[in-house]
Amino acid sequence: MIATSSSPLNLTQQLIRDHLVSGEMSPGKEIALRMDQALLQDVLGALVMLELEAMGLDRVHTEPTVQYIDHGLIQADNLNAETHLFLKSACERFGVWYSGPGNGISHPVHMEFFGVPGQSLVGCDSHTTAAGSLGMLALGAGGIEVAMAMAGEPLYLNMPNILGIRLEGCLPDWVSAKDAILELLRRHGVSGCKDTILEYYGPGVSSLSVMDRHVVANLGTEMGATATVFPSDEETLRFLSARGREADWVPLAAEPGCGYDLEETLNLSNLEPLIALPSSPDKVVPVREIAGEPLHQAYIGSSGNPGYRDFAVVAEMVRGRTIAEGVSLDVNPSSRQVLTALIREGHLEHLVSCGARLHQAGCNGCIGMGQAPAVGRNSLRTVPRNFPG
């Protein structure tokens, strides 16, 4: 049962309360929320900047606002390069941070440099929800809505249901956070959490690193979720402290005795390696059921698994070995910081020496921007998407 105004509040309710401009926290009712931060990617970023110009805005009101160049990286002609120049000039015009091509994917980079527990974030990218891993209220929206938020106007939406997911246990060996969200996709499907915010709580949360939580929050989008919210705890403090940002940390958690509109439990200890078959993220089966299928491409790196560990583990697996004949191993670093760390620790040498192909840090194959497999060939990918287009 959902809490009343005088009842204990879950974390999502606390975040919404702290940013509520108008409306009531009743599912289905329209609410207006103040946005603290804004995130842009380059496909919709140009449209947002044109909207700001049409408004006659002098300077954006959200701080920080960051324009990331992570989609249009292939410069087969002059168009992407000219878009980059336009966006850089627009950032200077409106007081927006600019992250140029090659710096990395917006979501993990934003977490590292700008994410603050308790703040709200709106982004013109569907996977903006990833910032919920830090205890933020992070929402994806269309270009016009994002432009209005940057101009100081509230973001309007209908109050979502809140699904409380209690995490128990811890991940077994060779099971990752990706398996946790794949299990939820198996349960709910790609549209089962529409108009719903997913809030994770319980003893299993502390066993997940912030980058593990990022994986789960990122793929909440594939379930149709409005947002994903994790508490801000000691793991969050550890993540921020490692980046010299411990001053940004605040502890955040659901109040004892709070309720949710919907509830379920996920025991991490019971999970096994899972995989989503073509062509939908919810077509989930155990990996053991398809073991032995021929593989022609393995693609590692996206906003769905951006952490250093994801690449380092693969590097150790291929160390001193050579990839099989006829297989393309594509390595797509999620950020310049991850790439630098892989170089410093010697992991990149193992990846390159085994025959891997190294791509620039960005969205690339996840959005269909390169690395398309041959017709009829199996491509194993860590990206959130496995459907045509």
Would you name each region that the model predicts?
Residues 1-389:
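Fe-S-dependent hydro-lyases/dehydratases of central metabolism
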